[in-house]
Each structure stands twice: as C-alpha cells, then as structure tokens.
Amino acid sequence: MRAHLGTPRVPAQLHALIADDCLGEHAYGYLGAHQPMPPQPSWEAGFRVMWNLLLDDVVASGCYTPPESDRLRELYQRHQHHFEHPVEPRLLHMDLWAQKLLVDEVGNVTRLLDLDRALWGDPEIEFAVLDYCGISEPAFWRGYGQARDTSPSAEIRRRFYLLYEVQKYMPIRVWRRGDPGRAGVSGA
C-alpha cells in the first residue's frame, strides 16, 4: 500500500491532542460515550484494563482457554514496569489506514473516518497498528516529524501492542460469524 505524503501528519495532529485539554481530565483508555471502561489515572493502568478486558473477550469467544488467558495476564504482569513511563494521554485513532482518509482532488487529507476505536493513551500503541497495516515505514517517520523510540522497553511495549492488535480480531471473527454457542452469547 502506498501512503499519501500527508498521511503521517494525520496521526501527528491527533497525537497533539491531550485528554487534559480536550476532556478536562487526565485520563487514559477508551473513554467514549459508550463507556467501555472507566477512566484510568496512568497509561499502565489504562493498558492493563484494556489487556484484561480483551483477554476476557478472547476467552468468552472460545479462542483461548482460561489457563491460556492466565498465562498472558501473567506475562503482562512480568513486563508491567515497561508501561510505567511518563506519557501524556494523547488522542489515538487506532484504526488508521488509507481507507479511513478522505482526500481532495489534489491529495490533501480533508476528513478522517471511523473514530469508534479511538482512545487516550501512548502513541506507541497506534504505531503498532500502523506497523500491522504496513504504513510505518521510514517515509512515514520523516513525515511524522518525530523519531520512534527504539529503547528496549519500547520494543517490549511494541510487542504487547502488536499482540493486542492481533488478538482483537479473534473474538470479532467468532462473533461476526454468528456462532452464539462458541461466542458465549445467547441470541446473537
């Protein structure tokens, strides 16, 4: 996929928005009107809640057994300290790829679609989504205007973020197939 030259500016502009200024509170996590989780006071707490809620969904969909989920929870606990770094709660789209951008006839990005997965947190998790979509290339980083953190702690976070992204699709696939027995949902 060939990204438009303006594409890196879109997440850079989103990431410039801080929850404190936009919401009037210092909060992390999915904080939309649908209230999927309570606001959290730190990124580590926010991601921990997100991680555990996702694992609950993966188990409910029948994709993991409870012992498999427990091993992933324990893995996070062992690496939790890597998420305890100071980071402002930035606005993250979490589903940014070419089809989510509207451009005018000369190629300027004019609209951003689908903010239903947006959250407040560490931009590094958004970069994992961009990696997954094949957007995070050297040209992206030049356009974004900030170098990527390549520290050992950032690499560990990146692996968790990528695993988080991939695991999201496990229950989605089961539940969209309409298999209520396997999904643990009655009447779906």
Regions found by a protein language model. Give the residues of each.
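A glycine-centered beta->alpha junction motif in the catalytic cores
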Residues: M1-R2, N52-A60, Y164-P180
